[in-house]
Swiss-Prot record:
HAMAP family found in the cross-reference section: GTPase_EngB (MF_00321)
Gene that this sequence comes from: engB
Occurrences of domain EngB-type G (ranges): 28-199
NADP among keywords: no
Protein's GO biological process: division septum assembly
Protein name from the UniProt record: Probable GTP-binding protein EngB
Stored InterPro entries: G_ENGB_dom, GTP-bd, GTP-bd_ribosome_bio_YsxC, P-loop_NTPase, Small_GTP-bd
Similarity remark: Belongs to the TRAFAC class TrmE-Era-EngA-EngB-Septin-like GTPase superfamily. EngB GTPase family.
Residues engaged in binding Mg(2+): 43, 65
Keyword line: Cell cycle, Cell division, GTP-binding, Magnesium, Metal-binding, Nucleotide-binding, Septation
Residues binding GTP: 36-43, 63-67, 81-84, 148-151, 180-182
Molecular function (Gene Ontology), one example: metal ion binding
Protein species of origin: Streptococcus thermophilus (strain ATCC BAA-491 / LMD-9)
Cellular component terms per the entry's GO annotation: cytosol
Length: 199
Protein backbone atom coordinates (compact mmCIF):
# COMPACT_ATOMS: atom_id res chain seq x y z
CA UNK A 1 0.00 0.00 0.00
CA UNK A 2 1.26 3.49 -0.82
CA UNK A 3 0.32 6.94 0.43
CA UNK A 4 -1.53 7.56 -2.84
CA UNK A 5 -4.02 4.80 -2.22
CA UNK A 6 -7.31 6.04 -0.88
CA UNK A 7 -7.98 5.08 2.71
CA UNK A 8 -11.22 6.12 4.37
CA UNK A 9 -9.86 6.50 7.88
CA UNK A 10 -13.31 7.34 9.24
CA UNK A 11 -14.45 3.84 8.28
CA UNK A 12 -12.91 2.30 11.39
CA UNK A 13 -14.18 0.04 14.13
CA UNK A 14 -12.83 -2.03 16.96
CA UNK A 15 -12.74 -5.57 15.63
CA UNK A 16 -11.78 -7.70 18.61
CA UNK A 17 -9.60 -7.98 21.70
CA UNK A 18 -7.12 -10.83 21.98
CA UNK A 19 -5.04 -12.36 24.75
CA UNK A 20 -3.07 -14.76 22.53
CA UNK A 21 -2.48 -15.78 18.93
CA UNK A 22 -5.47 -18.14 18.82
CA UNK A 23 -7.66 -15.03 19.03
CA UNK A 24 -5.87 -12.97 16.35
CA UNK A 25 -7.75 -12.22 13.10
CA UNK A 26 -7.06 -14.96 10.55
CA UNK A 27 -6.34 -13.07 7.34
CA UNK A 28 -3.46 -11.22 5.71
CA UNK A 29 -4.40 -7.57 6.32
CA UNK A 30 -1.32 -5.51 7.26
CA UNK A 31 -1.12 -4.42 10.89
CA UNK A 32 0.41 -1.43 12.65
CA UNK A 33 1.06 -1.95 16.37
CA UNK A 34 0.98 0.98 18.79
CA UNK A 35 3.08 0.63 21.90
CA UNK A 36 3.92 2.97 24.74
CA UNK A 37 3.79 3.38 28.46
CA UNK A 38 0.51 3.97 30.23
CA UNK A 39 -0.96 7.44 29.71
CA UNK A 40 1.47 8.37 26.92
CA UNK A 41 -1.54 9.33 24.78
CA UNK A 42 -1.96 6.17 22.73
CA UNK A 43 -5.78 6.26 22.64
CA UNK A 44 -5.73 9.96 21.74
CA UNK A 45 -3.24 9.21 18.94
CA UNK A 46 -5.52 6.50 17.53
CA UNK A 47 -8.63 8.69 17.80
CA UNK A 48 -6.85 11.63 16.14
CA UNK A 49 -5.54 9.57 13.22
CA UNK A 50 -8.95 8.02 12.66
CA UNK A 51 -10.87 11.27 13.12
CA UNK A 52 -13.01 9.78 15.88
CA UNK A 53 -13.48 11.04 19.42
CA UNK A 54 -14.10 7.86 21.35
CA UNK A 55 -13.17 4.89 19.18
CA UNK A 56 -10.20 4.12 21.41
CA UNK A 57 -11.27 4.84 24.94
CA UNK A 58 -9.07 7.31 26.76
CA UNK A 59 -8.79 6.66 30.45
CA UNK A 60 -7.71 8.54 33.53
CA UNK A 61 -6.70 5.17 34.93
CA UNK A 62 -3.42 4.01 33.38
CA UNK A 63 -3.04 0.34 32.61
CA UNK A 64 -6.67 -0.09 31.55
CA UNK A 65 -5.88 -1.76 28.23
CA UNK A 66 -5.09 -5.34 29.21
CA UNK A 67 -5.57 -7.07 25.88
CA UNK A 68 -4.41 -6.51 22.32
CA UNK A 69 -7.17 -4.41 20.72
CA UNK A 70 -7.49 -4.80 16.95
CA UNK A 71 -9.03 -1.91 14.97
CA UNK A 72 -10.20 -2.50 11.41
CA UNK A 73 -9.59 0.51 9.15
CA UNK A 74 -11.52 0.54 5.88
CA UNK A 75 -10.91 -3.22 5.49
CA UNK A 76 -7.39 -2.33 4.31
CA UNK A 77 -5.30 -2.32 7.45
CA UNK A 78 -5.51 -2.71 11.21
CA UNK A 79 -4.17 -0.81 14.17
CA UNK A 80 -3.27 -3.01 17.13
CA UNK A 81 -3.34 -1.23 20.47
CA UNK A 82 -0.81 -2.92 22.75
CA UNK A 83 -1.28 -2.81 26.56
CA UNK A 84 0.43 0.20 28.14
CA UNK A 85 3.58 -0.76 30.02
CA UNK A 86 5.32 0.61 33.07
CA UNK A 87 2.36 1.12 35.37
CA UNK A 88 3.37 0.54 38.98
CA UNK A 89 -0.04 -0.37 40.39
CA UNK A 90 -0.36 -3.44 38.23
CA UNK A 91 0.95 -6.58 39.93
CA UNK A 92 4.25 -8.11 38.84
CA UNK A 93 2.37 -11.23 37.79
CA UNK A 94 0.02 -9.19 35.57
CA UNK A 95 2.96 -7.24 34.11
CA UNK A 96 4.79 -10.48 33.29
CA UNK A 97 1.65 -11.84 31.62
CA UNK A 98 1.23 -8.68 29.55
CA UNK A 99 4.92 -8.77 28.64
CA UNK A 100 4.61 -12.32 27.33
CA UNK A 101 1.45 -11.44 25.38
CA UNK A 102 3.08 -8.37 23.80
CA UNK A 103 6.28 -10.25 22.97
CA UNK A 104 4.37 -13.13 21.37
CA UNK A 105 2.48 -10.72 19.13
CA UNK A 106 5.47 -8.57 18.13
CA UNK A 107 7.81 -11.47 17.40
CA UNK A 108 5.47 -13.99 15.75
CA UNK A 109 2.82 -11.99 13.91
CA UNK A 110 3.37 -12.15 10.14
CA UNK A 111 0.80 -9.39 9.50
CA UNK A 112 2.82 -6.87 11.51
CA UNK A 113 4.46 -4.24 9.28
CA UNK A 114 5.62 -1.56 11.70
CA UNK A 115 5.42 -0.58 15.36
CA UNK A 116 4.60 2.98 16.37
CA UNK A 117 6.47 3.44 19.64
CA UNK A 118 4.99 6.37 21.55
CA UNK A 119 7.00 8.44 24.01
CA UNK A 120 6.15 11.67 25.85
CA UNK A 121 7.95 14.65 24.27
CA UNK A 122 8.02 16.42 27.65
CA UNK A 123 10.12 13.81 29.43
CA UNK A 124 13.21 11.70 28.99
CA UNK A 125 12.37 8.15 27.90
CA UNK A 126 11.84 5.75 30.79
CA UNK A 127 13.72 2.48 31.10
CA UNK A 128 10.60 0.79 29.71
CA UNK A 129 10.65 3.07 26.65
CA UNK A 130 14.33 2.30 26.08
CA UNK A 131 13.79 -1.45 26.47
CA UNK A 132 10.89 -1.40 24.00
CA UNK A 133 12.98 0.43 21.39
CA UNK A 134 15.94 -1.93 21.95
CA UNK A 135 13.61 -4.94 21.71
CA UNK A 136 12.26 -3.78 18.35
CA UNK A 137 15.75 -3.09 17.02
CA UNK A 138 17.00 -6.49 18.24
CA UNK A 139 14.21 -8.31 16.39
CA UNK A 140 14.60 -6.00 13.36
CA UNK A 141 10.97 -4.90 13.57
CA UNK A 142 10.43 -1.59 11.73
CA UNK A 143 9.69 1.21 14.19
CA UNK A 144 8.40 4.77 14.06
CA UNK A 145 8.95 6.81 17.22
CA UNK A 146 6.14 9.28 17.88
CA UNK A 147 6.67 11.89 20.60
CA UNK A 148 3.24 12.87 21.93
CA UNK A 149 1.84 15.83 23.87
CA UNK A 150 3.83 18.38 21.85
CA UNK A 151 1.20 21.02 22.63
CA UNK A 152 2.35 20.98 26.26
CA UNK A 153 5.76 22.42 25.28
CA UNK A 154 6.58 25.70 23.50
CA UNK A 155 7.32 24.97 19.83
CA UNK A 156 10.75 26.56 20.17
CA UNK A 157 11.79 23.80 22.60
CA UNK A 158 10.68 20.84 20.48
CA UNK A 159 14.10 20.30 18.90
CA UNK A 160 15.82 20.28 22.28
CA UNK A 161 13.40 17.69 23.67
CA UNK A 162 13.66 15.62 20.50
CA UNK A 163 17.47 15.57 20.81
CA UNK A 164 17.29 14.42 24.45
CA UNK A 165 14.91 11.57 23.57
CA UNK A 166 16.99 10.45 20.59
CA UNK A 167 20.17 10.43 22.67
CA UNK A 168 18.57 8.38 25.47
CA UNK A 169 17.11 5.87 23.02
CA UNK A 170 20.38 5.61 21.09
CA UNK A 171 18.10 6.42 18.17
CA UNK A 172 18.87 4.92 14.76
CA UNK A 173 18.97 7.82 12.28
CA UNK A 174 17.36 5.55 9.67
CA UNK A 175 14.18 5.38 11.78
CA UNK A 176 11.43 7.98 11.66
CA UNK A 177 10.82 10.38 14.55
CA UNK A 178 7.58 12.37 14.58
CA UNK A 179 6.57 15.14 16.96
CA UNK A 180 2.82 14.83 17.49
CA UNK A 181 -0.09 16.53 19.24
CA UNK A 182 -3.63 15.20 19.33
CA UNK A 183 -4.76 18.71 20.36
CA UNK A 184 -3.20 20.76 17.53
CA UNK A 185 -2.90 17.81 15.09
CA UNK A 186 0.78 18.61 14.55
CA UNK A 187 2.40 15.55 13.00
CA UNK A 188 -0.90 14.14 11.68
CA UNK A 189 0.04 14.12 7.98
CA UNK A 190 3.59 12.98 8.66
CA UNK A 191 2.34 10.13 10.85
CA UNK A 192 -0.05 8.83 8.19
CA UNK A 193 2.47 9.25 5.36
CA UNK A 194 5.13 7.39 7.35
CA UNK A 195 2.80 4.57 8.41
CA UNK A 196 1.40 4.01 4.92
CA UNK A 197 4.89 3.97 3.41
CA UNK A 198 5.68 0.93 5.59
CA UNK A 199 2.72 -1.17 4.42
Amino acid sequence: MTEEQVLNTHNAEILLSAANKSHYPQDDLPEVALAGRSNVGKSSFINTLLGRKNLARTSGKPGKTQLLNFYNIDDKLRFVDVPGYGYARVSKKARAKWGKMIEEYLVTRDNLRVVVSLVDLRHEPTQDDIQMYEFLKYYEIPVIVVATKADKIPRGKWNKHESIIKKKLNFDKNDHFIVFSSVTRDGYDEAWDTILAEL
